[in-house]
Amino acid sequence: MDNRKRAVIIGMVLGDGYIQVRERPRKTMKPYVEKAMRVLHGPTQRQYCEFKAKRLSWALGGKKINVTKVKNGPGGNYDAYQFTVNHPYFGQVRRWMYPGGEKRYTEKVLNMLNPEGIAYWYLDDGSARRNIDKDGWVTSVSTEISTMCSEQEAMLIADWFKAEYGIEWKIRRDKRKSPDRAFYIACNTSNTHEFAAVVGPYVPDCMKYKLSHVAQVKSHERQAPVGECTSCGKTLYAKRQRGLCSTCYSKDLRAMR
């Protein structure tokens, strides 16, 4: 498999794709080993799921992949879209990415990525933050990838991005998680611009909102109001906790201490 096709697969597995290798019984013949990738997305990302199925089909030499609607979540109460595809190559991919049975970030795997693969990784696991001042102006932005890994792995990822693309990521920790699953990466406004330049050409139209924070900080346009403070009635330009403006929220915090 050539490097471009492999990078597409690696990026999808780093994101929401899951590879399972298991033995399946057959009544009249010897059991066979199933090597399958499953991708699942919520109802609002149907187009994205279909887009990924087409790109994976290309990577696998035109293998037909059908996206189906399924029930998901507790009690099967939620709609979702998924595809599952079997291919012998997934056995090798699993050995690279699931040493010991769990997904790990290694230099070998990272070196298999290209900008398109990174784009799928970000579209699945990435998010954006916007700092909006009291008058509705976006003053800065940041980009995060929820790697949720060990500190050592997060440092490896950050060092790799710096060496390969000149993009600087900071290591962040979610203290609610165990140390081996607590760390993720984030970059500031200037590095967000650099990152968007790398992945932007590979982001489908249905997922452009994942880079909207870059456009907002570039446009120098005031954001539209999203509501009013439930305490003082001040106009809000971003959703705040408990529907309060920053001043009222701070007052509430001090009152509770």
Describe each model-derived feature in a short phrase:
Residues 1-234, 257:
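Internal intein/HINT superfamily modules and their associated LAGLIDADG
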Residues 251-257:
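Short metal-binding segments enriched for Cys and/or His
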Residues 240-251:
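Cysteine-rich micro-motifs
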